[in-house]
């Protein structure tokens, strides 16, 4: 949650001067799993020393646009990161997570997130080099 991120940023800044990227996993409405919300993170963390704030995991790129826009509106000058999964997985009988979004669809949705205000783009669960290459090809 936001409180943990605040503590982490303050601890890092007290020890060294390195770039800090804070990403959160959130529900589709932007609320964190434990405390706070993505908007609050975008507003508060840069003031403590975070260089960028964003979202990771929790959903696919097709489901992050609203929260990215909320974060950018709350903190227009803060770089916003988006590192979604390759869609929402299905779980096999053996417990394996299978992600169904292919690299091209991932890149297309990521391009939309860029238009929504995300400045730093990457991938989380279910992505790999082919996904980032497809994203790079869309520049």
For each predicted feature, which ranges?
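Domain-level signal for soluble alpha/beta catalytic cores
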Residues: 1-139
